[in-house]
């Protein structure tokens, strides 16, 4: 009998070792990882990150935020790359989004925030309330008020919700949990313009889309916008718990001493890993190669699955790919796992692929072959 709350549906499988883009179970079986721990180990199990962690662990891994932390300054500088942002570090995407919600309200003096139907921003009370999915709120009582949910990719539905008390609009550029649904370019451009002209802050939730996942460091770079606030987590430290909220420097006074904080946020172990990740991702040619390989994966996968009657669409952005299907998701996940490939689901009818950015062409071909076999079997 387990000593754990049963709030997860766990497969009867444990991974105890990893090398590069592969996981190994207790029996020594090898699996190609197209899930990256739900978009976390974006670099696979990378030796450079491992060395950074080992080196930092031998020195000091935590100090309180009552003292200077040069590693936080280093990571913040790398994240903003010369742009006029300030950074706050925490431990997760939910915490990062909580910080974004708080600073948006405090900086504007307004309370209402518009998010989107089928969005996902986290499971803490504020981030859960921001999420446009009722299923994750069942049984927890009244949500935090003043959140309103627009229709994704529909600017008119946003405008209809705006009042004199609206502080911000909060958006995922790809709705990952609901089925890998990319935002349309025209919508994002028009939304950013509308927010700017009407004094609304634009918050971009990059928890899943950030850190190279879409082929650029941040997904908003694909859309040619610069948000007032954006949030990061998942891939930032490649598996070490960390989150970050970045906001324009003009809002710095909203987070003065005592206004917000995190005991573990920005600890030296997480910052050492984050710094190593950023060094790898910003190395000349790295993200360009990842983008090229992701395009190859999506193109070849679309071609390979054309004969599968149960596949209705392959879509995504970079290495964030959804296979929409009428087949049973549970059976597909198990069948791919049995063949040595780990994948995810999203929404009610999508197989979600979040592979490491470090995939080789051979590994891509291997994954496509397994997926083709599985979908042919479940045709």
UniProtKB/Swiss-Prot annotation:
Pathway: Amino-acid biosynthesis; L-arginine biosynthesis; N(2)-acetyl-L-ornithine from L-glutamate: step 4/4. One of its GO terms (cellular component) is cytoplasm. Its EC number is 2.6.1.11. One of its GO terms (biological process) is L-arginine biosynthetic process. It is found in: Cytoplasm. InterPro entries: AcOrn/SuccOrn_fam, Aminotrans_3, Aminotrans_3_PPA_site, Class-III_PLP-dep_AT, PyrdxlP-dep_Trfase, PyrdxlP-dep_Trfase_major, PyrdxlP-dep_Trfase_small. Its cofactor is pyridoxal 5'-phosphate. Pyridoxal 5'-phosphate binds at residues 93-94, 120, 205-208, 263. The modification N6-(pyridoxal phosphate)lysine is found at residue 234. Keywords: Amino-acid biosynthesis, Aminotransferase, Arginine biosynthesis, Cytoplasm, Pyridoxal phosphate, Transferase. Pfam families: Aminotran_3 (PF00202). It catalyses: N(2)-acetyl-L-ornithine + 2-oxoglutarate = N-acetyl-L-glutamate 5-semialdehyde + L-glutamate. GO terms for molecular function: identical protein binding; N2-acetyl-L-ornithine:2-oxoglutarate 5-aminotransferase activity; pyridoxal phosphate binding. Binds 1 pyridoxal phosphate per subunit. N(2)-acetyl-L-ornithine binds at residues 123, 262. Its main location: cytoplasm. It comes from the Bacteria. May also have succinyldiaminopimelate aminotransferase activity, thus carrying out the corresponding step in lysine biosynthesis. Homodimer. Belongs to the class-III pyridoxal-phosphate-dependent aminotransferase family. ArgD subfamily. This is Acetylornithine aminotransferase. It comes from Streptococcus mutans serotype c (strain ATCC 700610 / UA159). The lineage of its organism: Bacteria, Bacillati, Bacillota, Bacilli, Lactobacillales.
């Amino acid at each position: 009998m387990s000593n754990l709350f049963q709030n997860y549906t766990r497969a009867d499988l444990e991974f105890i070792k990893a090398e590069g883009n592969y996981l190994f179970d207790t029996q020594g079986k090898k699996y190609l990882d197209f899930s990256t721990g739900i978009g976390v180990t974006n670099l696979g199990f990378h030796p450079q990150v491992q060395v950074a962690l080992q080196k930092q662990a031998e020195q000091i891994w935590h100090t309180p935020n009552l003292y200077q932390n040069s590693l936080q300054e280093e990571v913040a500088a790398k994240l903003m790359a010369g742009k006029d942002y300030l950074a706050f570090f925490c431990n997760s995407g939910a915490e990062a989004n909580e910080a974004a919600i708080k600073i948006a309200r405090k900086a504007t003096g307004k309370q209402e925030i518009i998010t989107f139907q089928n969005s996902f921003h986290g499971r803490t009370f504020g981030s859960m309330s921001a999420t446009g999915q009722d299923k994750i709120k069942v049984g927890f009582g009244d949500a935090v008020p003043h959140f309103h949910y627009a229709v994704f990719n529909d600017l008119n539905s946003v405008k209809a919700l705006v009042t004199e008390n609206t502080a911000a609009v909060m958006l995922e550029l790809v709705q990952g949990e609901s089925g890998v649904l990319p935002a349309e370019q025209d919508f994002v451009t028009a939304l950013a313009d509308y927010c700017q002209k009407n004094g609304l802050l634009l918050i971009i939730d990059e928890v899943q889309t950030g850190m190279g996942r879409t082929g650029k460091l941040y997904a908003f770079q694909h859309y040619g916008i610069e948000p007032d606030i954006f949030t990061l987590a998942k891939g930032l430290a490649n598996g070490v718990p960390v989150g970050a909220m970045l906001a324009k420097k003009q809002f710095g006074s909203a987070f003065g001493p005592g206004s917000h904080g995190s005991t573990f946020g920005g600890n030296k172990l997480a910052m050492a890993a984050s710094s190593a990740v950023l060094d790898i991702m910003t190395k000349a040619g790295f993200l360009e190669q990842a983008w090229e390989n992701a395009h190859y994966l999506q193109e070849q996968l679309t071609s390979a699955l054309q004969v599968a009657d149960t596949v209705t669409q392959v879509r995504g952005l970079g290495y964030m790919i959804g296979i929409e299907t009428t087949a049973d998701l549970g059976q597909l996940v198990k069948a791919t796992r049995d063949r040595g490939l780990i994948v995810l689901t999203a929404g009610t009818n999508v197989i979600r692929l979040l592979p490491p950015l470090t995939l080789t062409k051979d590994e891509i071909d291997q994954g496509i072959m397994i997926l083709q076999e599985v979908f042919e079997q479940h045709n």
